[in-house]
Amino acid sequence: MLEERFSAGGFSARLCRCNTAVVGTGAAGYNAADRLWQLGQRDILIVTENRLAGTSRNTGSDKQTYYKLTLSGPEGDSVREMAETLFSGQCVDGDIALCEAALSAQSFLKLVELGVPFPRNRYGEYIGYKTDHDPRRRATSVGPYTSRQMTECLEQAVQAKGIPMLDHLQVIRILSDGHTAYGLLCLDTAAREETDRFVLIQCKNIVYATGGPAGMYADSVYPAGHYGATGLALEAGVKGKNLTEWQYGLASVKPRWNVSGTYMQVLPRVYSAAEDGSDEREFLMDFFKTPAEMLSKLFLKGYQWPFDVRKVAGGSSIIDVLVYLERCKGRRVYLDYRRNPVGGAFSYDELEPEARDYLTRAGACFGTPVERLGHMNAPAVEFYRDKGVDLARDPLEISLCAQHNNGGLAIDCWWQTNVAGLFAVGEASASHGVYRPGGTALNAGQVGSTRAAQYIAAKRGGAPEEGFEPAAAQALEQMGALARRTLQPQGNVRALWAQAARRMSECGAAIRDGGAIAVYLAEVKAQLASFERNVTASEAAELRWVYRLRDMLISQYAYLAAMLDYMQQGGKSRGSALYTDPAGKKPYAQLPDAFTFVLDDGSRGGRVQEMLYRDGACVFEWRPVRPIPKDDDFFENVWREYRETGNVG
């Protein structure tokens, strides 16, 4: 890595040069850097806003799942069968599904070799269990912190190799002409002097491992400190794909954590209260006829954690809806593990068979919810205690939260975007569709970063592309001028951020009304047009929020436009999104009219929505999914090609 200075328009920046810049220090980013080094590419630089932040290191659940090819037991499995499982999630490209299946075992076993303690039996089989949307038993876990342990082991591998890292650098512009990437402009959030404020990175390749656009939503289970940077990639000319497809689910507010699995299966008391904590009510019983019916649905919510519009009528997702509606009334909703629901006036024998049999086999038909939780999953209790929440003493506030973006930046089967040299890996990339088995995101992050590294090492070595200087000069002048204009005695950027995130949660999350989306879309467009005039920061330390807000608004604009386009093309409710449709039906008469909807019939599952953000407008294209490839697998042919090219490209 070479370092010097670059000046333009009265602004100066440090300049670093390298072949490949890896943006992000989650599991996907670290794996990309580690794989590049293993493959012989040593001119690498890792760039991160905060090494200890991010979703991989700071998120999880009661039993965080990693999805892999079956490596135990008598049941048959194959790369092709796993690819078909992934492909069946709708709006999934088959070549990507095949890659995620083909490299699954390799990626998983690398993590094992690095020290991630995935459980195996005495004979060496890596045992598994069945997760949602999983026809086999491909899921495995090391407990609540699977992705954290992955990240820490990969980080140790990277540090052992001495791969350089620049911490406290926030990417604020991707240097691109819409066809080729030339580098990055970053804000040094630790700089004390204006002359040290900006850092330019000239590189031939960018591995973009920035995670999903978490900052768009106020109601979010993404860890505090993770914001994403999808908007910057869209601005640079990268296509978005499946932007409408998300996962939302119930999560605690402080700390941010999925309340899935045993958190629901132990049947906590669910109640709401006024803002000041008064007027407690077990509001679910206003809807359900009997405690047994309510508790059976609550139990299933543990198994079926993501909000699924197919499970609103007669299923467990009615719990998500009722929590959402209660919060819309201005009330706060809590899980209470101290006391049994309905004053204990229920019988385990009256629960639906799945709930009754599970709790009986677990020996958990006794005591209070926290006692049941301690019996069934003691680490789940310890997690909250470590965060300052004692479930034996404190209620847990929850909300319906954004959890994962199945869509994102469009990629090919090497995880390269339509902008040459820009690779998107991890949640930043759009490798998933409407539905996916639990844990596939962790597998996809490892596979995608491996594929990107393989392509870069084989095809994109050498010096950076020509064209950097004009792109860098323009970006430095524009972003430098923005900093000077926004620094004012009174700052409003934090308030604008909070307002925008709240509006997105109100109209662009799990419950989507076309009219409300159109109204907020126009507001976002106006905010972007007046951004330089209306956004202010009271001190240099707030500039990070200025650039963050800019990225967030671009993301919101693109995602809202995608939702509106989906509806205009006749799209119906599917996955984790309920689209209000007056032509539909309400599953329950007592629900508000906003819950009148039509279920998608799956006929659009073979088409993908792609979007190009150009000159402040979104251009949409719908195309057929790419099928699962059926390549020649005759050994001698593959072997010959492998000897000649490594079968890369």
What does each of the following model-derived ranges do?
Residues 1-19, 32-35, 51-59, 110, ...:
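Glycine- and aromatic-enriched mobile tails/lids
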Residues 15-18, 194-205, 418:
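Core beta-strand elements of the Rossmann-like FAD/NAD(P) dinucleotide-binding domain
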Residues 18-46:
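N-terminal Rossmann-like FAD-binding beta1-loop-alpha1 element of flavoenzymes
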Residues 21-23, 200-211, 233, 423-424:
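Short hydrophobic core segments
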Residues 49-84, 247-251, 257-266:
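Conserved N-terminal glycine-rich FAD pyrophosphate-binding loop of Rossmann-like flavoproteins
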Residues 239-382, 455:
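An anion/pyrophosphate-binding glycine-rich loop and adjacent beta-alpha core
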